[in-house]
A protein has these predicted regions:
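Glycoside hydrolase catalytic-domain context in secreted enzymes
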Residues: 1-508
Length: 508
């Protein structure tokens, strides 16, 4: 909203700088982030932890983040936190929105020529230009049938292997063409469990290929200590090139030296705890500002907002993927009661029906995500180990009891009342089963307490009621387009079969 209203990205830089100070007080000097994948397929499960669908906006956000965390745009400064931005070269171009942690999501799709240069790489180029400490490579691999890709005139079409094993992407593109000088950190467990495109290689061959391709630091084993004996064995057998090992070791050690890891690796515990306590009020203030500016008024039919009178009767209903959220119901009931509204038990008794709606995807990739608000929708089942359809069906729910929305709306509208929706947007949902029944929709992205990590702050319900009552004007803008239907997003089985055919031909 700041930028759309003539402002800049300073709020993001202030957030990053405050977070940097807290990390520094705790003795933390490297972050496994931040995530700067561009939102392209709205079904992708990691969209909720990135920022935007606009490449230019992503580049500006990335610049602000690096300024705040690293202390500027000329490398890591004293007391800075080195960012390892991810997931290069953009993991969001995924087949049907599947996560690349699973074999169903191993493919990156580029349907148009130079899509990487136009859409996915501007954020990473901004990170390189600001001298980010590190870049994390993604799990997924490019499809053999992708459209032609170049960057600044350089051919970057590559083998169909994951980025950590891909010399074209790490050397030709990232270092030689984009100018990256930091270290490449692979994602976690890339060696054993998620080696897309190199499954036929042994772990010894894989680790040698990673170093030779341009990886410098091998990601952890899901939180377990990293065992580098394989790297030593591969080097002793001549499988890792001398120049590759020298590059990887040098870049890692230089980064540690820049962060004073050797000279001053520890913080005094009491000093650190005192600093954390001192930062709490600053966190509260900034979290409140960010939450306020993020609220988006998506619909206001017949100007039902702002609410002009307190004392009206309100029926509150909560919807999530797993049923009612008791905490949200309690917060809304408290907030409304304190403001003078009367809580009633039936929609037909109310002047206002307030819907608190928070859809979500299932946790695994056993089926294709849908952006529709559905309960127990039968969809094709996928085997996450093979990446193939099983031939069976499974139930998918994104919003339990979704049919009650129409019922509640009909009841309150029959009495001349209105429906107001508080929508927590974790994905670009298709709202055809919600929007027609609502007179007003206010979008939020996270609660104030979730942003701050504290429990005694103003809640998101308090903040939203201030907007609904007109005390605060909503200025936020959606970071992503809400699609009207799923048909334009789906990838056909024929396209995936073409990939398999291409692979079979390559093996032959």
């Amino acid at each position: 909203g700041d930028v759309a209203n003539g402002g800049d990205y300073s709020l993001i830089e202030r957030f990053a700088d405050l977070d940097r100070q807290i990390w520094d007080a705790k003795g933390l000097d490297r972050m496994y982030g931040r995530q700067i994948d561009l939102i392209t397929d709205p079904r992708w499960g990691r969209n909720v932890t990135t920022f935007t669908e606009d490449p230019a906006v992503m580049a500006n956000i990335t610049t602000a983040l690096i300024k705040g965390y690293q202390g500027g745009t000329d490398g890591l400064q004293p007391n800075g936190v080195g960012l390892i931005v991810k997931h290069f070269p953009g993991d969001s171009a995924s087949y049907n929105g599947f996560k690349s942690h699973y074999k169903t999501g191993q493919w990156r799709m580029y349907r148009t020529e130079n899509a990487m240069e136009k859409y996915f790489l501007p954020g990473f180029q901004a990170a390189v230009d600001c001298k980010t400490a590190g870049i994390m490579s993604c799990y997924s691999r490019p499809m053999p049938i992708n459209a032609n890709q170049t960057y600044r005139g350089v051919d970057i079409n590559s083998d169909s292997v994951a980025t950590s094993y891909n010399a074209t992407l790490l050397q030709t593109l990232l270092r030689d063409t984009m100018g990256f000088e930091g270290f490449v950190n692979t994602d976690s467990n890339i060696l054993f469990d998620i080696p897309w495109g190199v499954e036929e290689l042994t772990p010894l061959e894989r680790i040698a290929l990673m170093y030779n391709a341009g990886s410098d630091i091998i990601g952890d084993w899901w939180g377990q200590p990293i065992d580098y004996s394989l790297a030593l064995e591969a080097y002793s057998k001549g499988m890792i090139q001398e120049e590759a090992l020298t590059r990887a070791t040098t870049k890692n050690v230089v980064s540690l030296l820049e962060s004073d890891r050797f000279e001053n690796p520890y913080k005094d515990l009491q000093t650190s705890l005192a600093a954390e306590a001192a930062y709490a009020p600053k966190v509260e203030t900034l979290a409140l500002e960010m939450s306020t500016k993020s609220l988006v008024l998506l619909k206001n039919h017949n100007n039902v907002l702002p609410l002009k009178e307190t004392g009206k009767k309100v029926f509150v209903a909560s919807f999530t993927r797993n049923g009612e959220d008791d905490n949200k119901l309690a917060n809304w009931n408290r907030t409304l009661t304190e403001a003078g509204y009367v809580i009633v038990e039936k929609a037909g008794e109310a002047d206002i029906v307030l819907l608190d709606v928070k859809p979500d995807f299932p946790a695994n990739n056993g089926c294709m995500n849908t952006l529709d608000l559905v309960e127990d929708l039968e969809v094709a089942e996928y085997d996450t180990n093979t990446g193939m359809k099983t031939g069976g069906m499974t139930d998918l729910t994104t919003l339990m009891d979704v049919k009650k929305i129409k019922k509640y709306a009909k009841a309150v509208h029959a009495n001349g009342g209105v429906v107001i929706c508080s929508l927590t947007l974790s994905a670009p949902w298709i709202l055809t089963k919600l929007e027609p029944y609502c007179d007003a929709i206010l979008v939020n992205f996270a609660s104030v307490t979730e942003l701050a990590g504290l429990s005694e702050l103003v809640t998101i319900t308090d903040l939203q009621l201030q907007v609904l009552s007109g005390a605060i004007m909503p200025t936020g803008k959606l970071p992503v387009t809400l699609p009207s239907c799923t048909a334009v997003l789906e990838v056909t089985d024929t396209e995936i079969d073409a990939v398999r055919l291409s692979q079979r031909r390559a093996r032959l």
